[in-house]
Amino acid sequence: MVFVDYLSARGLTNCRGSGALNAAEIGRDVLAAARYLQGQPYVKASQITAVGWSLGGGAVLAALGQLPAAEASPLRAVVAYYPYCRDLQPWQTKVPALSLMGAQDEVAPPEVCQRVFAQLPPGTALQARIYPEARHGFDVSDLPSYAKFGSEIVGYNAAAYAAAAREVEQFLSRKSD
């Protein structure tokens, strides 16, 4: 497992209120990390999956749009938890993607992603799930169910977390060699 630390590499401690960050730039970091992993002898290169949360979720989706058509993808799949899609552009790739969103998300509203997803070409391998009572951070068990994050509300939702965990497990098991 590798975590792409897109904050400290840019001298930042968080992504809140930073116009210096966008999903496309971080998507390039994701692809660079995946390409690096492909060259490591201890890595099964055909099994590299990128998983991201919030801005990182938008980044793993943005990485799909940066894959050259003639190049084999270093990613077998991507999973995006409550992705931040404001900067996201439609992509065209065969790499399967799973997007898990909360209908009550005020930080990364699912409607923004849905507009992008509606522009994807037919045959794009995307599964999008929206959990009705879930907010941003629905899988973070350390959060209360209702917490302020700046002016937005975030919170843990046990039912959405359990459903998303099952969804991810099923999604990834279908992608195994």
What are these regions (language model features)?
Residues 93, 99-101, 105:
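Short beta-strand/loop motif that positions the catalytic acidic residue
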Residues 95, 109-119:
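Short alpha-helix in the alpha/beta-hydrolase fold that links the catalytic acid
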Residues 24-94:
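Primarily recognizes the serine-hydrolase "nucleophile elbow" in alpha/beta-hydrolase
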Residues 5, 51-53, 79-82, 100, ...:
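Alpha/beta-hydrolase-fold catalytic nucleophile elbow
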Residues 1-42, 140-154:
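Serine-hydrolase catalytic machinery in alpha/beta-hydrolase-like enzymes
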Residues 104-108, 136:
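Acidic catalytic loop of the alpha/beta-hydrolase fold
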Residues 125-177:
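C-terminal catalytic histidine-bearing segment of alpha/beta-hydrolase fold enzymes
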